[in-house]
Amino acid sequence: MSSGDGAPETAADDNDRRLRVLELYSGIGGMHFACPPDKTRVVAAVDVNTTANATYAFNFPETRLLQRNVQSLTARELDALRPDVLTMSPPCQPFTRQGLQLDSQDPRSASFLSLLRVLPTLKHPPTYILLENVKGFETSSTCDAFLDVLRDGGYHAHRYLLTPTQFGVPNSRLRFYCLAKLNPLRFSDCPTACDAQCNQEPPPNVTKCDRPRKLYDFLEQTEENSCSDYLLPDRVLSRFAYILDIADATSTNTCCFTKGYGHYVEGTGSVLLQASRDLMHEVYRHVQPRTAVQDNVLESLRTLRLRYFTPVEVARLMCFPDDFRFPPELKARHRYQLLGNSVNVCVVGSLIRHLLDDVGN
């Protein structure tokens, strides 16, 4: 891991004709996994989170990784990297429904606003830009400032509100995406400049799926006892049984997994039923809203063997490849936190390929 300039590029790097990607707010590398290797190579990644960077370096040991706040990046440093593609997923907390929605007044917006001041001064601006954030970002003053920078810089931008279920993945994770190309490049499906609204359907040339796959395909096929560490404890069953979002192996959807999954209960993600649905319906006849369950009902709830999805399963639902790994010393709670802050690799990968549809043609 590097906190400075990293290793110098070699002659072989100079001969590599693939597009150069700069990954800002790189997290655990979701954007990197999403970039098509035949068209792109990530020349640098930047993030301030040490735990995320340890995971990134564990999966991409050869990539130049800068342990820095994006706010510290200068125009000179960005120009030296010569990125053709800029990907970024800025902090979402200023725009979430659960937060205070302080928008640009939130200190966590400072690094992105600083970047917006630097971008217009670049001598070598990126040709392609992809940004991901939560629903709510699209109505913020921060987004308005971002779109102003794109327009003034000669970019053509398309905006989307998309969820993985539209791509066949059984997980709801509605996110805002902005794709931008520098003039004179245009989007093949719509050659106009910045759209006036967010599209809620994927681009026409992106493969959609009307029926998501079943959860079974994403579960760890292990002995049931091996997941005993993930069973919901009695304190959760007794207090929160009524508000749980419960899925089973045949389900075609799960709720969005957040960084609080496994620690908090309400609104952080679905849990998995390891018994029959008939048994679940019978047991839940005795579960009352907003009331702690009686001992006999708690005993019945235990028979459902409700458990959290494992970090491996959450990673699969986020479409990380099977060879994605966390450092072995990282605890489950931290793995959930990192996944909750990451991007869906399938959705981003489809959009990047759409963004780069004019490359290599």
Model-based region annotation:
Residues 2-126, 135-141:
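Core alpha/beta nucleotide-donor-binding catalytic domains of modification enzymes
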Residues 14-17, 57, 170, 248-250, ...:
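Intrinsically disordered, low-complexity regulatory regions enriched in Ser/Pro/Gly/Thr
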Residues 29, 50, 113, 141-144, ...:
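A structural signal for well-ordered alpha-helical segments within the folded catalytic domains
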Residues 34, 55, 114, 145, ...:
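Amphipathic alpha-helical segments that form well-ordered structural scaffolds
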Residues 37, 58, 148, 164, ...:
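Ordered, helix-dominated protein-protein interaction surfaces in large eukaryotic regulatory proteins
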Residues 73-83, 95-264, 270-280:
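Class I S-adenosyl-L-methionine
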Residues 225-361:
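C-terminal target-recognition/interaction regions appended to catalytic cores
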